Amino acid sequence: MNPTDPPGLDLDRLRAHLDAHRPGLVAGELTADVVEGGRSNLTYVVGDGRSRWVVRRPPLGHVLPTAHDMTREFRVISGLRDTAVPVPEAILLCEDADVVGAQFYVMSFVEGTPYRTADELAQLGEGRTRAIADALVDTLVDLHAVDPAAVGLGGFGRPEGFLERQLRRWKKQLDASRSRDLDGIEELHDRLAAAVPVSGKPSIIHGDYRLDNVLVDSGDEISAVLDWEMSTLGDPLTDLALLVAYAERDKVSLQFVSNASSAPGYPTTDEVVRRYAERSGRDVSQLNWYVSFAFFKLAVILEGIHYRYTQGKTVGAGFEGVGAGVPLLISHGNEILKEEK
C-alpha cells in the first residue's frame, strides 16, 4: 500500500482487480479521496484523470454482525437501476476480502449536491428548499411503490415479523457495542416490544433515508439515492419515521446531525407526513411508535460509531461528539411512547 493511498483502500490492488474483471475501464493511474460526511461505511471517489467512480467498503476495525453488507448494497442498486428511483450504476462487486482488506463494490459517480445544513438550503431560497424537500418525500413514495419481485428483489428480505426482528437485531447490535451504561435504553426497548403495530403492505425500504443520503441536481430533483447498507424488504413506515426523527434533531440537541430541516421553506413534520400519506395511500395513524423506534435505532447506530471512535477505528473528523447524543435519543424515544398513553 502506498503512503498516498487513503485509509482502507490499496489503489494498486484495486487497479489490478479492475483491470482483471473490467478490462478497459481504467485508463490511467488511480487517485482517491475519502468522502467526508459518512459515519459508517467508507466511501471514496476514485479517478484516473478521465473518469470517476465511487468505491464503498466496510469501516475499519470493529464491525457489527449483519451490518456493512456490501453485497446487499450492490444488489439493491442493481435492481432499482431501471425504476423511478434514481441510483448510481452498479459496476462491480468484490466479495474477496483479500483484495483491499474487505468486501467492496464500485459504482458510477453521479453529479449532484448532498445538502447537509440549513445554511446551504437557505442560500437557495424558500421556494427551492421546499421543492427539494418535496422531491425527497416523493422519491421515498416512489421507492415504496416498486414491486420487489419485478426488479429481482423478491427474496431481498422477510417482511413477515419484520418489526419484531428489527427490535431483536438492534438490541443485539447494541449489546455488541455496549461499553458504558445507557440509562433508559432497556425501558425504551421493552416499551417498543410491548406495543409492536401490525405492518401494512411491505416494500423495499432504504433504512437510513434522509436529505444528506441523496444527491440533488441543478433542477432540484433527486439525482441519486445513496447509502443502501441497511436496505431490505419490510415496513415502509420505518423509512418515513426515520425521516421525521432526523427532522426533529433540535429536540434532542444533536449538533452533528444535519439541520437541513430547520431551513426557511422546509416543510413541517406534519406537512411531510401528510404529503407521504396522500401520495402513497398508506395509513400513518401509528407513526409515533415508528418514530420512537427510529430514535432507538439511531441510538444503537451512534453507540456503535462511538465505540469504534473510542477504539481509534474511525476515519475522518467529526466523531468526537457522537457518543454524547446517544442518551438524548434514548430519552426522546421514551417520551414519544409515553405521549401515546
Segments the model singles out, each with a brief description of its role:
Residues 1-25:
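Juxta-kinase regulatory segment immediately upstream of eukaryotic protein kinase catalytic domains
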Residues 31-187, 195-204, 217-219:
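ATP-binding pocket architecture of kinase catalytic cores
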Residues 157-158, 283-294:
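All-alpha amphipathic helical-bundle segments outside canonical DNA-binding/catalytic cores
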Residues 204-206, 211:
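Catalytic-loop of the protein kinase fold
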Residues 226-231:
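Activation of the activation-loop gatekeeper triad in protein kinase-fold domains
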Residues 238-280, 294-312:
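Active-site activation/catalytic loop segments of kinase-like enzymes and analogous catalytic loops
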Residues 282, 286, 300-341:
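Helical subdomain adjoining the active site within ATP-dependent kinase catalytic cores
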